[in-house]
Amino acid sequence: MGMYTELVMSTRVKEVPEVVGVLQYMAGNEPRPAELPDHPLFKTSRWEILFQCSSYYFVPRISVLFEHDDIGHYWVLISRADLKNYDSEIEKFIDWIRPYLEATNDDMIGYSRYEETREPTIYYGVP
């Protein structure tokens, strides 16, 4: 069967149209973009449902908010989901999104937690 890994994100995303379009799609707000970025994340079979997966092993259920902050001129991404991370979708997502975040290496952007692990993996912005 396999174990679940939880992903929780809370971060600011730069105003990059290609990135915003993909995240809008992943959040269920917009249709799939015609062109996808050239990154290993988009070669995985389940990247599209990364924010939509949920099991009974983690609480709460899925939650995703992706909205524009008109004052700060950035997008806010807040999400919580969990999936069987067979193809390292979580790590590939973090690798893809990190350069587009309004975050430094001191800013926590989220965490992941494997079902049988006590301590989460904390993710920070780019140095």
Sequence positions of predicted segments:
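Short, extreme N-terminal segment that most often corresponds to the first beta-strand
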Residues: 1-34
